[in-house]
Amino acid sequence: MNDLQLSAELALFLTKLPGEPGIYRMLDEEGTVLYVGKAANLKKRVNSYFSKQNTGVKTRALVSQIKSIEISVTRSETEALLLESNLIKALRPKYNVLLRDDKSYPYIHLSNHPDFPRIELYRSKKKPPSGNFFGPYPGVAAVRETIVTIQKIFKIRNCRDSYFKARSRPCLQYQIKRCTAPCVHYISPENYKLSVEDAIRFLQGKCQIILDELAERMKQAVSQLNFEEAAVLRDQIKNLRLIQEQQGVVQLRGDADVIAIEVRPGFACIQCVTIREGQVLNSQSFFPTVPYAVLDEELDANSLWQQTFEAFVGFYYLDTSERIPDLIITNQSITESRSLEYILSQRRGKSCKIQVNPRGVKSRWMDFAVNNLRISVAEYVSKHSTIKSRYQALKQLLALDKNIERMECFDISHTQGESTVASCVVFDTEGPRPSEYRRFNIEGITPGDDYAAMEQAVTRRFKRLIDAQLLPDVLIIDGGKGQVSIVKRVITSLGVEDITLLGVSKGPSRKAGWEKLILVNENREFVLPEDSKALHLLQHIRDEAHRFAITAHRKKRQKTRVESTLESIEGVGTKRRQALLQRFGGLRELAKAPLEEICKVQGINEQLAKRIYEHFHP
């Protein structure tokens, strides 16, 4: 043990730790989890934090705050790594390397519809639906681009099941040759299944297998004089070969992930290049939150690299064994490479190797990954230097003593008082934090009363923030002096004092650059020059709050109008309304539906069906 002053209780605990695999949680005096780790031998690993040799910056800072330690013994290292990954995601401890929440990374989902599966973008914290998932992808745009490619080549439907069931004729997707209209049985379940299987192989990077099968099918179609089907297959082959050329096929088979990591003061970047069947299928960047900002010792930089790699393994591979490749190539040696190989191989059900300093074609893959890593790091630094300079400009403008760590902005949206919604967006030193955005459905006020709407939203929000001890440094209101005064009264009544309250009024012309700023703390109003960095930051936050509010308002308004339209028809209550919408997918399709189709809806007799039909066809 070192000369740290350990409590008698903690010292005794360290002597009684088991020499088995498991995870450990280090807590401060308030019971907050500071760090979660895994170990093949809990006794050796946990005691190592308190040895004289462990002098790293991070370790010293961590150990100085430890009040107690909790452990969970597991049956294997694999189980320990899985449990560690899940706990880090759930608890987000201060001293762990934290990758962004899963919600931030979108997936492609193929549903498990028995006959005609649907392809869609999926991103949610909720329990995922059954079916096949592919990803994660670097962003929504990448997912949408891939889905469009799959629709063009394999013609997989992307419509909701409720819409699919209600179709009586093909939709626009069929007309533009992105769907085979399974809704009206223009394709058999057997042939559609072949297309789905090809799409899955495509997403797995198995293009050559698809090409071989398509060529064989085309040959059979020609021999059977089915020239129309042969032409379709020919076009699929042509499009797939074009994609192969774009992806850069190399003379090497097998699957690999190439992972290049760079650790900088304050952040780390992970570049993951996905190679499937010898093709560069994808390249994406991850920017985990690192547990401390200053790396003043080589040991700390190396240990953080190791921790970053292990965190990525837990985040990226352990949720689904299908993503684990034959080979993982890295740009730095791994301390526990054999242990990780064993864990990944067990999870996968077959061998997975980790390789450092590759040669030949594999070295070209690593060069590709490192080049992309450098570009990603440069873009990140450029973006965040801009954000940092804007934050500094706002700090100087507001004459604040401390740095701005967190800002929140509120906006109200409605259409002549209908379906009023308030939005709250959150920015920190990294920029927008979409996972912390909140929307508020405003009820019980006079329609169009923006003051009452703002009062209700801020009151609800700040009661939660006070309980969570997560108050912003700067509170921005998209509105004039009246709304800002209301908010000032609300936060004062809640006992909140140490917050800078700022109003952003649109000005008489409502043009960008002419905003009037209302600084409540100093009781002054002013306009900033158009090239002001502080103004650009405020405009960004204000525009994001407005976008989020108006999107939520439109959804609520559409839902309200659908409900009110149907409920105005005598005999249509909540259950029948839901049955109609489930059958037809929306008002537009219901309005187009013939009388005999409406009669088929459960709970709708002929008389009521006629009344509904006449409502849309007066």
From Swiss-Prot:
Molecular functions per Gene Ontology: DNA binding; excinuclease ABC activity
Biological process annotations from GO: nucleotide-excision repair; SOS response
Subcellular localization, as worded in the UniProt entry: Cytoplasm
Chief location of this protein within or outside the cell: cytoplasm
Gene Ontology CC terms, in alphabetical order: cytoplasm; excinuclease repair complex
Matching SMART domains: GIYc, HhH1
Occurrences of domain UVR (ranges): 208-243
Alphabetical UniProt keywords: Cytoplasm, DNA damage, DNA excision, DNA repair, Excision nuclease, SOS response
InterPro entries: GIY-YIG_endonuc, GIY-YIG_endonuc_sf, GIY-YIG_UvrC_Cho, Hlx-hairpin-Hlx_DNA-bd_motif, RuvA_2-like, UVR_dom, UVR_dom_sf, UvrABC_protein_C
Domain GIY-YIG as annotated: residue spans: 19-97
Gene3D superfamilies reported in the protein's UniProt record: 5' to 3' exonuclease, C-terminal subdomain, GIY-YIG endonuclease, UVR domain, UvrC, RNAse H endonuclease domain
Top-level taxon: Bacteria
Presence of keyword Transport: no
CDD domains associated with the record: GIY-YIG_UvrC_Cho
Pfam families on file: GIY-YIG, HHH_5, UVR, UvrC_RNaseH, UvrC_RNaseH_dom
Subunit details: Interacts with UvrB in an incision complex.
Family: Belongs to the UvrC family.
Described function: The UvrABC repair system catalyzes the recognition and processing of DNA lesions. UvrC both incises the 5' and 3' sides of the lesion. The N-terminal half is responsible for the 3' incision and the C-terminal half is responsible for the 5' incision.
UniProt-recorded name of the protein: UvrABC system protein C
